Amino acid sequence: MIEHRPPAWAACLLLLAACGQSESPAKNSVTVKLPPAGVPVAPESSYSSIDPASCKVVGDSIRRCEGAAGYALEMDGEVAIVAPDGRRSILDLSKLGTKGAPKLGAKAEWRGPAPGHPHVLIVRVGSDLAIARLEYPACIVAVVAQQSHQNEKAREIADGKLPACLSR
């Protein structure tokens, strides 16, 4: 019996023919479309409720509100950001003139290059907007007093180079 084998160059042709073909992604993979290099990515916001009715009570008195991308806010007289890995950072709201438990708005805005990748939290405290960086240890980096275009001003700060923490 004579064995017929294709020439070695045939394998090269098959490889070249496959070039330019797209592979189908694995079933458990995530495909992210990125803009071309050098094109800036517009920041995006996602929102979560911090209304007491939508949060759960953990322990004796801590109210835990789920946020974006695995983050959470915990409140019991103070406000803490809980990172996806479980690390807690207590936000110092004393610079906002709050006495006792701070009066928070009904929602938190999580801002970053994509909804699933926030790097900043914007939350209403009284009539002010507090901007907190999420990088551990999280901290408040700016406060925007009540004014016209307050939300836009807070987003402008959040989308730029973040200032240093206001206090530790």
Residue ranges and their predicted role:
Residues 80-125:
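Mature extracytoplasmic domains of secretory-pathway proteins
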Residues 47, 55, 73, 108-110, ...:
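Generic structural hydrophobic/aromatic packing signal, biased to beta-strands
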Residues 1-17:
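Sec-dependent bacterial lipoprotein signal peptides
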Residues 3, 19-93:
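Charge-rich, low-complexity N-terminal segments
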Residues 112-168:
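A short, solvent-exposed beta-edge/loop patch
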Residues 12-15, 33, 103:
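Acidic/proline-rich low-complexity IDRs
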